[in-house]
């Protein structure tokens, strides 16, 4: 879903980039970030609010709380990736793919090594897998907006206003939806 939303902006972004209008291009990237951020926020909020009941009803013989926590940690990664995903296209447009490729390879190697170390030498178990991925996805919170701005020759903090707005919106959305959810009766079976 997120990939489809991101891809839908690409033809217009390409057209604007070809025209050389950087200001309009940055504005369009911010719109794309807002859209993909909104989609990832809706998914995350829905899962935070309803996920526990979903797992409890869907998999009654499994440890629903464990599954819920793992799912939330995985989706927290998507909160980061969701908002910066459109910026990956900057590297394709500007033909500056080396740095993002090296960062992706490096974080992949660090991810595997750190998972192995945490699984082998700690009692984290499955949490080690999702937590290392979450922590390393935060790298994209820093490198992607800065390098995208660098490639477009704009101020390095250009995209952070959209990212901060995304995180604030996510926090408010989760709070309001959870508050509303608590007003409904408990869900004990598929019919209620």
Predicted feature residues:
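Helix-loop junctions and terminal segments of transmembrane helices
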Residues: 1-33, 88-93
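Helix-terminus/linker motif at the lipid-water interface of multi-pass membrane proteins
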Residues: 1, 12-16, 52-63, 181-188
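Residue-level recognition of pore/gate-forming positions within transmembrane alpha-helices
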Residues: 31, 44, 53, 78, ...
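Transmembrane helix-bundle signature of multi-pass secondary active exporters and lipid flippases
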Residues: 1-7, 39-43, 74-81, 136, ...
């Amino acid at each position: 879903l997120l990939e489809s939303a991101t891809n839908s902006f690409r033809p217009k972004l390409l057209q604007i980039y070809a025209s050389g209008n950087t200001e309009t291009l940055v504005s369009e990237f911010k719109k794309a970030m807002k859209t993909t951020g909104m989609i990832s926020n809706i998914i995350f909020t829905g899962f935070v609010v309803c996920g526990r009941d979903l797992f409890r009803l869907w998999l009654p013989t499994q440890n629903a709380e464990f599954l819920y926590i793992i799912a939330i940690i995985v989706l927290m990664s998507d909160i980061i990736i969701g908002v910066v995903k459109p910026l990956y296209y900057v590297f394709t447009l500007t033909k500056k793919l080396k740095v993002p490729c090296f960062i992706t390879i490096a974080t992949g190697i660090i991810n595997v090594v750190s998972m192995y170390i945490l699984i082998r030498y700690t009692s984290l178990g499955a949490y080690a897998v999702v937590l290392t991925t979450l922590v390393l996805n935060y790298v994209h919170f820093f490198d992607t907006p800065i390098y995208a701005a660098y490639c477009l020759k704009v101020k390095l903090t250009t995209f952070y206003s959209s990212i901060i707005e995304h995180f604030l919106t996510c926090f408010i959305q989760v709070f309001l939806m959870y508050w509303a959810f608590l007003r409904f009766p408990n869900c004990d079976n598929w019919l209620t």
